[in-house]
Design a protein with these regions (language model features):
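Serine-hydrolase catalytic core recognition
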Residues: 1-244
Length: 244
């Protein structure tokens, strides 16, 4: 990261990768407290298919994630979404400096906490990201369930800034819709991240006249399974190919 923290990540390159060429990059991330995506394992998803289309896919576990010790995990306590967004933006800037990357074609994607992060990065990125996809995103920690939120963000009376300063509904004014294409995806029957999150995000963006795209899945839950699992992934793949 730019402040010299060592972060763990992985990179997937096209099979015919040529360092003399410039490639678009998609950051895929979850970034939630105590989580881990960068590990020795194999679990391909839609974004990995982008590699066969000539994209580089990068994943970095930011500060606050797991398996780096208690101190590292607790860095984000009471302020969810600040350090993690800083680290993902730092990752994007690092990739933009690489000779084999097209700096004008960097995107970010995330689901759930990752969707919260994708919005935060799109809004705070100052046009760095050409595209962002946020699926089932938390848009205000005041809307999410207390057993999770209070565990990692403290009580709202004790940490009001942690609840509000990094919540995407309060950052819509920062969104540069002239340089970043944004897709928000949500199921109306999501009992984890309630659909209210996306509706309030839409209200904030609409009020400011911001342009974005949305895909709504009627009666679908947080995972979009089983009915729309394939549809949502094809939607995201096509959206990326068209906008990144």
């Amino acid at each position: 990261a730019e402040r010299c923290d060592e972060l763990r990540g992985y990179m997937l390159k096209p099979l015919d990768f040529d360092p003399a060429k410039r490639y678009p990059v998609l950051l895929t991330q979850y970034s939630g407290p105590g989580s881990q995506q960068v590990a020795e394992g194999w679990g391909p998803d839609w974004e990995d298919a982008l590699v066969t289309h000539g994209y580089i896919v990068v994943c970095v576990d930011p500060r606050g994630t797991g398996y780096r010790g208690e101190e590292f995990k607790k860095l984000t306590y009471g302020n969810l979404g600040r350090l993690e967004v800083e680290d993902q933006i730092s990752t994007a800037r690092y990739m933009a400096r690489q000779s084999y990357v097209d700096p004008a074609r960097i995107g970010i994607y995330g689901w759930s906490y990752g969707g919260f992060m994708a919005l935060g990065c799109a809004f705070r990125g100052e046009g760095l990201f050409k595209m962002a996809i946020a699926v089932a995103p938390v848009t205000s920690w005041r809307y999410y369930d207390s057993i999770y939120t209070e565990n990692f963000n403290g009580l709202p009376d004790d940490y009001p800034k942690g609840y509000d300063d990094n919540s995407p509904v309060n950052l819509a004014h920062l969104f540069r819709d002239d340089s970043t294409r944004l897709l928000i995806v949500h199921g109306t029957a999501d009992d984890n991240v309630h659909f209210q999150n996306t509706m309030e995000m839409a209200r904030a963006l609409n009020k400011l006249g911001k342009q974005y795209d949305m895909m709504v899945y009627p009666d679908q839950n947080h995972s979009m399974m089983p009915d729309d699992m394939i549809h949502v992934r094809e939607k995201m793949l096509r959206y990326t190919l068209e906008n990144l």
